[in-house]
Amino acid sequence: MFDTIAAIATGNSIQAISIIRISGSDSFKIVKKIFTGKIGKNKTITYGNILNHERKIVDEVLVAWFEGTNNFTGENSVEIFCHGGIVVTNLVLQLLIANGARLAERGEFSRRSFLNKKMDFVKAEAINDLIHAKTIRQAQISVNKFDGKISKDIESYIDTLLYLIATCETNIDYPEYDDVENLHNETLLPKIKELIQKLNDLIKISEKASIIYNGLKIAIVGKPNVGKSSLLNALLNEERAIVTNEAGTTRDVIEASFQIDGFLFSISDTAGLREVQNNIENLGIQKTFETIEKSDIILHIIQPNEAENDFDKQIEIKSKNKIYLKILNKKDLIKNHNKQNHMIKISTLNKDIIELENKLSSYCNDVEWDNPNLIYSQNQLSMIKKSYLALSEAKEGLESGLTPDVVIIDITKAWESLVNIKGKADNELLLDKMFSNFCLGK
């Protein structure tokens, strides 16, 4: 049983209404000490006043009552709706603390929800992602995780691994019992291969989704005065970078963010690449190549009738494992468009960049965002990959002739990685599985 906590749920600012949340076994008792209205039935709202220690009215409020475990935190909870002034809201909060509540820590209500098994880590992360979503698309994707579909799939993988571990342990420790499945290489290997395939499919559909969800990184590169800064300004729809006819004005990397079709992009405008004697400008060129390394998409800007130089070739080489797009600026000066069919044509002067925007959008929409099995959390995806690698080790071991009692170490690692997505791995689960599924107590 936890102590009773309280906090302002709506932020400490002036607004029409503020909400103060209280959770814990003594929630009703503490609120009753300062509230003149009735204690309502579960999931009802009552009206009354909040009184201070001198029994003077602090505010008139509505109070929502949540009794028992069928609520967000899984314990008695109360929500007080008061007027949204900073002073009055904090007065109510201080009265709750003075009468026995403790000021909640950051995320403590959600932590209690998790500890009381009202949600798992997948949903907890989805809620946090929804709160911090920077785009409508991110918000929609986060909400898709609320139905628990991916949690149910991962739970089935966990159950399968748990069964295999428990059965292997039973074969080792209790070989005399013939009511337990006898796992050997021929029976264990197909089960391992099936799980590996499922995890591999999950990784494939999720890797790109994870990168896109968290924001694709774009680098704008090219010679001086080809329109790099103008393209940055056009994509941002604001004058973020200074545009002049003088070469070498961009010496440091300029970074900004923008959206296309609800997807987030972070973009870097880099120094123009040319032979220089100036140490400062040379440092800017070094930073350009560092930015290419860190980026997902490279926009290589060129102009009509310009010959390639060594820097252009270096850009292509360093962009080998990236999404590389050659952008032809000043398309209004192009006489023969057929010669540049492989390029994306834009005009930064006229802010005509629709072809480029459509191309960037197509990369994002190539993912099935409605697929409930998508994992976009880097943390969750890393756990899936660890499980996949551990099972691959187990598979190789079985194929090379190792017995189940040896590869069980890798199978257990795979299980622990998946359980860490749902919550903390607990070896008691293994014991529970062994003694609940098999007749070992006789």
UniProtKB/Swiss-Prot annotation:
Positions with a binding annotation for GTP: 225-230, 244-250, 269-272
Cofactor binding mode and count: Binds 1 potassium ion per subunit.
CDD domains named among the record's database cross-references: trmE, TrmE_N
Amino acids binding (6S)-5-formyl-5,6,7,8-tetrahydrofolate: R21, E79, K118, K442
Signal sequence interval, chain numbering: none
GO CC, any one term: cytosol
Residues that bind Mg(2+): S229, T250
Biological process annotations from GO: tRNA methylation; tRNA wobble uridine modification
One Gene Ontology MF term: GTP binding
Enzyme superclass (EC): hydrolase
SUPFAM superfamilies: Folate-binding domain, P-loop containing nucleoside triphosphate hydrolases, TrmE connector domain
Protein's UniProt keywords contain Phosphoprotein: no
The enzyme's E.C. designation: 3.6.-.-
Cofactor(s) needed by this chain: K(+)
Alphabetic keyword roster: Cytoplasm, GTP-binding, Hydrolase, Magnesium, Metal-binding, Nucleotide-binding, Potassium, tRNA processing
Residues in TrmE-type G domain copies: 215-365
Subcellular location: Cytoplasm
Listed PANTHER family: TRNA MODIFICATION GTPASE GTPBP3, TRNA MODIFICATION GTPASE GTPBP3, MITOCHONDRIAL
Similarity comment: family membership: Belongs to the TRAFAC class TrmE-Era-EngA-EngB-Septin-like GTPase superfamily. TrmE GTPase family.
Subunit description: Homodimer. Heterotetramer of two MnmE and two MnmG subunits.
Protein name in UniProt: tRNA modification GTPase MnmE
Lineage: Bacteria, Bacillati, Mycoplasmatota, Mycoplasmoidales, Metamycoplasmataceae
